[in-house]
Amino acid sequence: MEIRPFDQAVHQHRTMSVRSATSSIPMDRSPEAHIETEMAALAAGFVNSTDRHVFLTGKAGTGKTTLLRRVVAGTHKRCVIVAPTGIAALNAGGVTIHSQFLLPFGTFVPERRLPAELVGSGRFHDRYTLDGRHPLNAVRRQVLRDLDLLVIDEVSMLRADVLDAIDHRMRVVRGRAGVPFGGVQLLLIGDLFQLPPVVKDEELQVLQRWYRSLHFFESLGLREAGYAHIELDRIFRQRDEVFVRVLNNLREDRVTADDIAVLNTRHRTQLSEEEREGLITLTTHNRTADELNSAAMRR
């Protein structure tokens, strides 16, 4: 595991954090489990011992979701888990960002008032309309007032303008207008090689006035606050080193002839119905997937 920037607090709390965080984790004597447990303890210790915002990343299979669960289970801080989509929120055991913060669908412009040419379009929102037309209810306001730690999973899909809308919500509700995210610590989890933010051309043309890109790390609030970067670099999901190499090369767009040869050893053009049983079929269209699923349900 690599931590950048290497905050002094990591050195100060590492031994204590590993000792305290592992006590509630089921014992597994394998080397992989020991490494994973140590990483979980270090990440949990960093989150618990500092108020620094953290971006936790890593390739698929490095244990990001496992770490999320262990950090949340072991923290003394009051926390909420959110994610950009319903499926991501369900997998993380949380709720969607728009549900938790009652954000309107559309584009958030990080200004008190919209530029004149955007007024009346109905597709753009500013701080004024967010507060006046889309207020938080009492329950959600109290949750945000009590909050210490906000965990955002699948953060690669999170747009910078949405993160700034979250920032504004928390500054207002918590009465700390001059402090990014109202003083709430962020734990941002995701892989930037996976799904990017979705943005229409019209939205991008407008938002380019404030953002260099729409990735979450261009959020004005996050740039003001800064964050530590923790990268998990040990893959636990796959044990086959050759297959891990192929997956890494695919991820980084540097596939070799040897990689293709490895993949082709698994290529079969004809499979019987019995052999297909239990296999996952990937399709390019929802209609094809629906037909296959319906046929399987009828059997």
How should these model regions be labeled?
Residues 2-299:
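Conserved ATP-binding/catalytic motifs of P-loop helicase motor domains
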